[in-house]
Amino acid sequence: VAIDELGDLVIKTAAGVVTHRRPVARQTIEGLVQEIPARFQLSQTTPGMWQAGLDVGRYDATQKLVIDPVLVFSTFLGGSRDDQAFGIAVDAQGCVYVCGQTTSTDFPTAGTQRNQNSSGYDVFVSKFSPTGSNLIYSTYLGGNDNDRGFHLAVDASGCAVVVGQTFSINYPISKPFQANYGGGDRDGFITKLSPNGAALVFSSFVGGSGSDDLTCVAVDPVGNVYAGGNSSSTNFPVLKPFQAANRGNFDSVALKLTPEGAPVYATYLGGGGRYDSAVGITVNAVLLFVGLQYVTP
């Protein structure tokens, strides 16, 4: 743990570096806002052990003191119609990636893979500079029906991997492991964009003849891709499965791809309940899925 030259608190953990921005303190007295000096400080409790705290300047102890973190940036992102963000990720350089769905035909695009809404809801993927002052790229992804981006992750090269659901039989694909729409109500999709957002590294349908969604994704240090979701299909494209068959109405599904998009495994994960779905995924020394289950007593 350390305090850098900007006054930010920097904590190194096994999962990476966590930075807490220098705090800002204020009081409002008789309608006037007064800035109060505030900073992080470190104290050594025992040899090798440090404790972080706050050092606050003189203030009126009879009035409320507000201590806030610094807002790095905050911005609108959207067009003239319905825009919703569902997923966010940050890369090693601090660039921010956002995905979701939009019906706007004037959604802001820059450096795009696609610059026009196809129909209804399209997926959007946008990348911001670390300060939020520059929209590095922003693109639509979609076919002739509704498409939604639920989650994304970013690899070490700055490639965004997006997962979601598509109702479009012509969702854009490239080097797919499943080239055709599986049928049924909807399919999941998994799409990897180039670092500048202008090209598809790979993009594939993921689903069978029922309803399929991919809801979460993670990338390991060497670029392997892990995704999870749910499926009502009895013919979901399994490969080297832990569980080969759907055991309920909707089962969770999990899959792993190489950095180039080739499948390593795909499996059901579920019981006999009405609905199972993966809702979160992380990769460290082990692969961890979290999900939900609905069962009938």
Predicted regions and their residues:
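Residues that cap or anchor secondary-structure elements
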Residues: V1-S80, G87-V90
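A sequence-level/structural motif corresponding to short, flexible coil/turn segments enriched
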Residues: P47, G53, D60-P297
